[in-house]
Design a protein with these regions (language model features):
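Flexible, compositionally biased loop and terminal segments
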Residues: 1-196
Length: 196
């Protein structure tokens, strides 16, 4: 049986890379009269199900945009709740290595709490030899921020302006070596890419 109780048919060609903007959790909770935090918990649970299903059907790459650089502007209580949920998730994510899922985090880790950074590193190190799904989790990620990060890295390496190419910038992105997403899905139904 498939993810939604239907028989799986994976004989067709799969895309290589699907990206999901994990949004709409707060609106989902509000519609049900629940606190926003309940929406984030439900979203995290759904994410785990989706990641395992994508691994099962043989998808190569799944990227989830979990927390953008712009999300820091949300109320402190909500951000703290998301960070606590992230801690719990990262402790549980160690199970992914047993499922042959390779976990990688995208984004600027600098403003994150030390314990969260340590858990991220533990997950990456623990799953580095996995050969199944490449699961990219974007935390404190923004598309523009990623470009700035790449350019700063190039400048720090002392590469002259005349040697800077599109490929060089691409090679210095958080997403270096990955194919571009074939699909970007927003569960909220919005038709915008935000800062991803």
């Amino acid at each position: 049986m498939g993810l939604f109780g239907k028989k799986e048919n994976t004989a067709r060609t799969l895309p290589r890379h699907i990206a999901i903007v994990m949004d709409g959790n707060g609106r989902w909770a509000k519609k049900r009269g629940l606190p926003r935090s309940a929406g984030h918990v439900a979203g995290a649970k759904t994410f785990k199900t989706i990641a395992r299903y994508c691994n099962k059907i043989g998808l190569e790459y799944l990227t989830v945009y979990a927390f953008s650089t712009e999300n820091w502007k949300r109320p402190k209580e909500e951000v703290d709740g998301i960070m606590n949920l992230l801690r719990d998730y990262l402790k549980d994510a160690e199970n992914f290595k047993d499922e042959n899922i390779k976990v990688r985090f995208l984004g600027d880790r600098t403003p994150l709490a030390d314990d969260i950074k340590a858990l991220m590193l533990k997950n990456e190190d623990g799953s580095k030899d996995a050969t199944g799904l490449n699961l990219n989790i974007a935390i404190n990620y923004g598309g523009r921020d990623e470009i700035v990060h790449a350019v700063k890295k190039i400048i720090a390496a002392g590469i002259p302006e005349s040697k800077i190419t599109e490929q060089l910038i691409s090679d210095n992105l958080y997403t270096a070596g990955m194919p571009d997403p074939d699909f970007i899905i927003r569960p909220s139904g919005e038709y915008r890419t935000s800062n991803y």
